[in-house]
């Protein structure tokens, strides 16, 4: 007999956990749609030559390729005959949602209205080394605004407002959207004489590690043989990336101080101007100043970001790391079209976020069920009544299960409790003779009678009053 087991790197949930996960998806989707983003889905696999526009490197080593049994047989036969391999398999599973978006926009460019506002919530696949908290299959929940030729910086502020709306409704505790601009970093590096493009990108990648690896690690790396940056310059870089703002006015003051002390090179001046505009618009969008700050160390490791960058963290749980990130890029689809398609977007890695929240004990919705009520059956002769009660409840918007076979009441209560069902409806001879049903509330441990015709509306009121937030922060110590 084969031992049942899931592959490593997969998060498989029990039903009540899946309900909590699904509700988080629903919150994210609802907020994306409130801001006018349109749904898009792309195939789970793409043509390999389209997906892997840059061959080699870490990305290709993590890609899952797809090959039919016929193609495998043909490849094996060719190998037996000494023929050379025909190259990569034709198809590959997507490893993020950004490359499929680039292909999608380029392919449908003349059918889309720009700026194109899309959201996409699908699984992606990476051949990660199996370890705790790392997944080979995981959900990403992305939004992007794509422009044609140009895209206003105002959309960068709107994206930050979307981040705030999502996490405010999720209710997973206080959070902070940390904001920076790559032009700010590049302009500052230029003022230190670090102007060569590849060197700048390499320094940016190291700076982005400062929160994870610490300032001393970054200092040793930048001053080491690989970079050879003078110690005095490294000190200036570390002092610069240590800047954090506290409140809206302080953020603007930090930008003014930077402009005064360093001097506004073209690149630095653009970065400062863009951040100023984003900050002013974020305020106009109603995002509270406690929800965002400047953090000059945020660079985002991906090289295609060119302007605004975001990282979101939970204030009381920094060990969880970034829960949402993204930024501005200048040309999304340069490998697929000559059109210039700048954009800005963010991604929530929901699988990892959910896993981290569960590990930290922050998921409050796990004890819930999508079934609100169960109609008990104590006597075979009352099956028709039980089915009618369930039908009326469903019409009234109450998700309802019926016990199809009579059992002892205690066993039916036990079943409902284990399934996370809150209300058990009892319709025995005595209740029906009085025109009522009895309702057992397993959460409050109370029982009450309700007129049969008022049952659905009564339970609706009870559910609305007791509607708990999906997730809650741990109470302050």
Swiss-Prot record:
InterPro entries the record matches: aa-tRNA-synth_II (IPR006195), aa-tRNA-synth_II/BPL/LPL (IPR045864), Anticodon-bd (IPR004154), Anticodon-bd_dom_sf (IPR036621), His-tRNA-ligase (IPR015807), HisRS-like_core (IPR041715), HisRS/HisZ (IPR004516), HisRS_anticodon (IPR033656)
Per the record, the similarity remark reads: Belongs to the class-II aminoacyl-tRNA synthetase family.
GO BP, sorted A to Z: histidyl-tRNA aminoacylation
* Gene3D superfamilies to which the protein is assigned, alphabetical: Anticodon-binding domain (3.40.50.800), Bira Bifunctional Protein, Domain 2 (3.30.930.10)
What is the official name of this protein in its record? Histidine--tRNA ligase
| Single GO MF descriptor | ATP binding
Where in this chain does the entry annotate a coiled-coil region? Answer: none
The record's principal subcellular location, in a coarse class, is cytoplasm
CDD domains according to UniProt: HisRS-like_core (cd00773), HisRS_anticodon (cd00859)
Indicate the quaternary assembly: Homodimer.
Q: Does the keyword DNA damage apply?
A: no
